[in-house]
Design a protein with these regions (language model features):
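Extracytoplasmic/periplasmic copper-protein system
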Residues: 22-26, 32, 105-117
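Short beta-strand segments within Ig-like beta-sandwich modules, predominantly Fibronectin type-III
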Residues: 71-76
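A glycine-anchored, Pro-Gly-centered beta-turn/N-cap motif
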Residues: 88-97
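Sec/Tat signal peptide C-region and signal peptidase I cleavage site
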Residues: 15-21
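Short, solvent-exposed loop/linker segments at the N-terminal edge
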Residues: 34-39
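Short strand-edge motifs at loop-to-beta-strand transitions and within beta-strands
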Residues: 78-82
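Cleavable N-terminal signal peptides
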Residues: 8-9, 19
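Short, surface-exposed alpha-helix to beta-strand junction/turn motifs within ectodomains of secreted
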Residues: 43-68
Length: 117
């Protein structure tokens, strides 16, 4: 009987942690902190949970600080894509804000580089 109570308690606790977890950036393309040979056509961000499209956004700025993202991102499930305007070599800054389906807001940022060192 004690074993059954312990197992049920552990499962209940694990479920509670999973339900209340925030979403995190799982991976990005271009990769976080990477250097790519040529400017990508889009930035793709994949998160650990599905996103609420109406409350999620991404902004990409180029080497001169001007925005190079081409409008609203496309969101499907846990993935967000945004097209990029033509831009040259240098450092790019990606800043994202998302609301996951569990209603938790998360934000973050990273850089990637186009061209040489």
């Amino acid at each position: 009987m004690r074993t059954r109570i312990l197992i049920v308690s552990l499962l209940w606790a694990a479920l509670g942690v999973a339900v209340h977890a925030h979403t995190f950036l799982d991976h990005a393309s271009p990769l976080v902190g990477s250097t790519v040979a040529s400017a990508p056509r889009e930035v793709s961000l994949t998160f650990t949970q599905n996103l609420e499209a109406a409350f999620s956004s991404v902004e990409v700025t180029g080497p001169n600080g001007a925005r190079v993202d081409a409008g609203k991102p496309q969101i499907s499930g846990n993935t967000m894509h945004v097209g990029l305007k033509a831009a040259g070599p240098g450092s790019y800054h990606v800043r994202w804000h998302v609301l996951s389906v569990d209603t938790h807001k998360t934000e973050g940022n990273f850089t990637f580089r186009v061209g040489g060192p």
